[in-house]
Amino acid sequence: GSSLNLLYQDTVRKMGIDPSRIKPTKTTFKGVIPGVEANCTGSVTLEVVFGSPDNFRSEELIFDIVPFRSGYHALLGRTAFAKFNAVPHYAYLKLKMPGPRGVITVNGNTERSLRTEEHTAALAAEVQSSLSRQFSSPATKRPDTVKRARSNLQQDHLARSEQA
């Protein structure tokens, strides 16, 4: 998953991205929703710009669109960092990369980061609770029931993100 650039379906809607720009994809990955393989709903190529008007970098990145909610708008993967020659420093909430007129530094916001982390933790707890309920019944010993539970969970997250 860390090699993917992810864009959440709600973010796509809020950005007003024309649906004709979204291409079909069969990309799947694990690790965002515990115990569930996620299927991307499409992909879109977007221009991403970092810096200031006099010192900036611009690259086109392919984002895979995911059908669930998050406290984030998008996640950049290793390929994005490599394309920009960027180095993230998570403890200081900074991203640095070379620019045409010197180093470009993108600063994070500590307060907003903490709020987002709390929101994401609440979503993870909700998913974990839902999985626990689904897998605690005796019927889940059958493999087809496990597949159904995962599918129901993904559909539930899709429905919630469309309502938001």
Ranges and model annotations:
Residues 3-163:
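Aspartic protease core domain of the pepsin/retropepsin superfamily
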